[in-house]
């Protein structure tokens, strides 16, 4: 279990690259809901925020979050970075959905825009991983005797 591995210190960090969904139905029907010709009410509640939960208990581990925002990108991403106890936050907009290219900002806890990365999603991901390796993984690696 990922949560157990994180809490027991077996994992050195977390890349919270995707939120499958922010909301879930309050009630789940056990069977298909048949059509009636009438509207149905769908009540939703927020899902648990895994990155925030693990970030609050990270200790010496590192946490990288991602924020897809439709407005006030940087401001909202920085608020998430702080609220989720992240070491870095990668921010982008909805134009990334179903696109082959992406543009992101990598933000630090002091509010700095570390860098802006643009290119194919693969190239952007490779650069993000290089930044994580350089700033978080290598920086916390024990120094050999």
Segments the model singles out, each with a brief description of its role:
Residues 1-145:
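A cross-family phosphate/adenosyl-ligand binding-site feature
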């Amino acid at each position: 279990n990922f949560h157990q591995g994180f809490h027991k210190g077996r994992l050195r960090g977390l890349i919270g690259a995707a939120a499958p969904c922010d909301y879930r139905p309050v009630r789940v029907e056990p069977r298909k809901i048949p059509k009636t010709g009438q509207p149905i009410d769908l009540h939703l509640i927020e899902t648990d925020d895994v990155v925030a939960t693990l970030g609050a208990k990270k200790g010496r581990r590192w946490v990288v979050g991602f924020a897809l925002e439709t407005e006030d990108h940087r401001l909202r991403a920085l608020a998430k970075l702080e609220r989720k106890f992240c070491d870095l936050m990668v921010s982008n907009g909805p134009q990334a959905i179903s696109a082959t290219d992406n543009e992101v900002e990598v933000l630090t806890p002091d509010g700095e825009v570390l860098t802006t990365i643009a290119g194919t999603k693969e190239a952007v991901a490779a650069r993000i991983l290089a930044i994580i390796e350089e700033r978080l993984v290598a920086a916390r690696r024990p120094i050999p005797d």
